[in-house]
């Protein structure tokens, strides 16, 4: 993927219908331009993603030996160190160590579409964007800039984009449902998140297809990722009010811990009455009582695939993606029944 040369000050001046000097004055807060003209020029420069910084313009013309990592799920959460959620640090650690083995540095970048954008952020050799959203503005920015990128998880808005890798989530979800069924479950609830990414969208599609294949009526509940344990506990009460199921699969460990707390308050025994599992392992699932069955994501293998895809994309080579890796489902006490007829 060839990088674009970027927007120049002359491009901004032409779009705004003013001189190059006027653009410079508007962006630097100098000169005698009217307030209206200054605001209009700045708005046009921002719309065109113009980089006024000379360092950024210079770096963009050559390799800097560094790539960016954008954690879209953390951007959406509004916090970058959620308590007890270690899956993101595992991906960050794996990507950083493996990149260094290849002579690359990794820069963690919060949503680069939010102003002001650090100049270096748009001068990196490429990007890994995790869990892109529908019509993701970060992907849009990278596309406009001609910056090579790959994604952790498919881009739901770009079905023809193949430079992505992830765990085989469809297989993982089906394995959990089959585990529930083998332990006697005849009614299974899915609690998913609300972020508009492929993980949420595809997991619900997988769940509904599996339910149809075995003749189970689907029951889907949603709780915003940022609601965490509190959101899971609230949903647990709604689930019980609607009819206690044999099993519940939650997307996140925080949701699962909250659901466990809510079920306990309502007197629903886990796993004897209702089995429980999470699609993403965390401190919450490991330290709950009972410990909650969960999918341990394969950060090491997945980030290796992402780096392979990104380096090939930077070099302009054909896509070898998508790549699916294998996660591990850890069965714990929350879904382990001694009597499968319970």
Predicted regions and their residues:
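Short acidic/polar active-site loop segments enriched in Thr and Asp
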Residues: 19, 65, 125, 186-187, ...
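Hinge/beta->alpha junction and helix N-cap segments in small-molecule ligand-binding domains
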Residues: 76-78, 82-87, 110-115, 165-175, ...
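Short, well-structured alpha-helical segments in soluble
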Residues: 114-123, 232-243
């Amino acid at each position: 993927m060839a990088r674009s040369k970027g927007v120049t000050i002359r491009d901004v001046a032409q779009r705004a219908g003013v001189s190059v000097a006027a653009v410079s004055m508007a962006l630097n807060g100098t000169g005698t331009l009217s307030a209206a003209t200054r605001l209009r020029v700045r708005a046009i420069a921002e719309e065109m993603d113009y980089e006024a910084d000379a360092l950024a313009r210079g770096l963009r013309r050559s390799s800097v030996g560094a790539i960016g990592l954008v954690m879209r799920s953390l951007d959406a959460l509004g916090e970058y160190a959620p308590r007890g959620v270690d899956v993101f640090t595992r991906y960050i650690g794996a990507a950083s160590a493996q990149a260094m083995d290849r002579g690359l540095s990794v820069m963690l970048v919060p949503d680069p579409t939010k102003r002001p954008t650090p100049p270096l952020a748009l001068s990196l050799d490429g990007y890994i964007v995790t869990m892109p959203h529908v019509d993701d503005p970060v992907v849009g920015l990278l596309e406009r800039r001609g910056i090579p990128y790959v994604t952790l998880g498919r881009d739901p808005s770009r079905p023809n984009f193949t430079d992505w890798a992830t765990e085989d989530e469809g297989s993982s979800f089906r394995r959990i449902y089959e585990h529930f069924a083998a332990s006697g479950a005849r009614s299974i609830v899915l609690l998913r998140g609300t972020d508009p990414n492929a993980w949420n969208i595809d997991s619900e599609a997988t769940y509904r297809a599996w339910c149809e294949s075995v003749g189970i009526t689907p029951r889907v509940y949603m709780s915003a990722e940022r609601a965490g344990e509190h959101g899971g506990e609230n949903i647990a009460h709604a689930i019980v009010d609607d009819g206690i199921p044999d099993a519940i699969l939650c997307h996140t460990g925080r949701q699962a811990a909250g659901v466990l707390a809510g079920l306990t308050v309502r007197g629903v025994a886990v796993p004897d009455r209702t089995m429980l599992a999470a699609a993403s392992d965390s401190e919450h699932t490991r330290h709950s009582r009972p410990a909650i069955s969960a999918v341990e994501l394969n950060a090491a293998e997945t980030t290796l695939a992402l780096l392979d895809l990104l380096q090939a994309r930077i070099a302009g080579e054909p896509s070898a993606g998508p790549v699916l890796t294998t996660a591990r489902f850890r069965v714990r006490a929350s879904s382990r029944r001694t009597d499968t007829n319970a």
